[in-house]
């Protein structure tokens, strides 16, 4: 459930994960400021594709510009971090207002993407790629 912060404003919290990245997201009503690790959103996320991935829960629920979002993200690369931010924003929106649940769940934003890099096996070049086979 949403908690209220010092000023009495509703505060939604969510933790998102993707690959090896973890994002802690805090949402409250405001002007639409988005900060990632104390940096502006446009400075931290420079690729347009990753921006749309990270903000897709807000676009889906038509809440872009209604909330101030503070994100602390660590681990992994920029693609995994964008996915973790998307997951965290979706969970925080659900925590703030439960009427978003059906919209977010139907688009699978509340589900954690469990795909990770497969480990390399011994006797092989990569996880699945084998060395060249010679009959003779």
From Swiss-Prot:
A GO MF term: structural constituent of ribosome
InterPro entries membership: Ribosomal_Su5_D2-typ_SF, Ribosomal_uS9, Ribosomal_uS9_bac/plastid, Ribosomal_uS9_CS, Ribsml_uS5_D2-typ_fold_subgr
SUPFAM superfamilies: Ribosomal protein S5 domain 2-like
Single biological process term from Gene Ontology: translation
Gene3D superfamilies membership: 3.30.230.10
Annotated GO CC locations: cytosolic small ribosomal subunit
Keywords, alphabetical: Ribonucleoprotein, Ribosomal protein
Superkingdom of this protein's organism: Bacteria
Family: Belongs to the universal ribosomal protein uS9 family.
HAMAP family: Ribosomal_uS9_B
Protein known as: Small ribosomal subunit protein uS9
Organism: Borrelia recurrentis (strain A1)
Upper classification of the organism: Bacteria, Pseudomonadati, Spirochaetota, Spirochaetia, Spirochaetales
């Amino acid at each position: 459930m949403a908690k209220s912060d010092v000023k009495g404003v509703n505060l939604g919290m969510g933790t998102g994960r993707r690959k090896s990245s973890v994002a802690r997201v805090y949402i409250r009503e405001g002007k639409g400021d988005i900060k990632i690790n104390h940096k502006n959103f446009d400075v931290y996320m420079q690729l347009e594709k990753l921006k749309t991935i990270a903000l897709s829960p807000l676009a889906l629920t038509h809440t872009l510009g209604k909330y101030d979002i503070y994100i602390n993200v660590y681990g992994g690369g920029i693609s995994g971090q964008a996915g973790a931010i998307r997951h965290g924003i979706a969970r925080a929106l659900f925590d703030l207002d439960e009427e978003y649940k059906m919209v977010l769940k139907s688009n699978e934003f509340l589900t954690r993407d469990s795909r990770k890099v497969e480990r390399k096996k011994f006797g092989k070049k990569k996880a699945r790629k084998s060395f060249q086979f010679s009959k003779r």
